[in-house]
Amino acid sequence: MKLVVEHLKKSYDAKEVLRDIDFTFEEGLIYGLLGRNGAGKTTLFNCLNQDQMVQGGRFYLEEEGGTREVKPEEIGYVLSTPTVPEFLTAREFLKFFMEINGQTVPAPESLDVYFDLIQIQAEDRDRLLKDYSHGMKNKMQMLVNLMAKPKILLLDEPLTSLDVVVAEEMKQLLKEQKQGRITIFSTHIMDLALDLCDVIVLLNHGELERVEKESLDQQAFREKILEALRENGE
């Protein structure tokens, strides 16, 4: 399976944010979408998630020798600021999510299977989500997106504000869950992209460029990216 993006364009008034996005993402890989703040990473995600209309180009899935449009339910989108129903307990939230997604989310013998996956402790599973820390809310947001088994998982800087322990847990979870889907992880932190991602893609001046890291040592790789980000910088 491949997600093919062809000549995607998006502008806000006179500001051209996505100039000519042309790239193919492949199943089973984590792509690091690297770019400075304001480069258009969130705009690209909003277009792929069909929250915003594009002004040129298209994107589609290529699988089994054919092509087709991406269905909304095939996309999971994890925001940098977690959005969860704070009036529910964590267990109630999972039950509710499974009820409204019964056709796509398999029912486990116990919800504790899912809590174990993201290392939410037993004493926290029946607490209100409003009492969860930012990191725990982020875990819950990540969990329901993984439960839905989307073909495309968009992660908009989800680890930026997490503490070191939670961030490491989330990185390990993403690596374990990458098979069978296309994962695109946006960040402006170079070391995080290098550590987590299989492929690095640079969003700069409204265009995507794959940066081959296999043939570069760490320092040369950093310098290449920094040089690209400095050119005609905002």
Predicted regions and their residues:
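Conserved structural motif at the start of ABC-family nucleotide-binding domains
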Residues: L3-V5, L18-D20, P72
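The feature captures the beta-strand-to-loop junction immediately N-terminal to the Walker
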Residues: L34-R36
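Helix-to-loop junction immediately C-terminal to a conserved catalytic motif
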Residues: N49
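Conserved ABC transporter NBD signature motif
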Residues: G56-E73
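Helix N-cap at the start of a conserved alpha-helix in ABC-type nucleotide-binding domains
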Residues: V164-V166
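Conserved beta-strand-loop-alpha-helix hinge in the C-terminal portion
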Residues: E207-R230
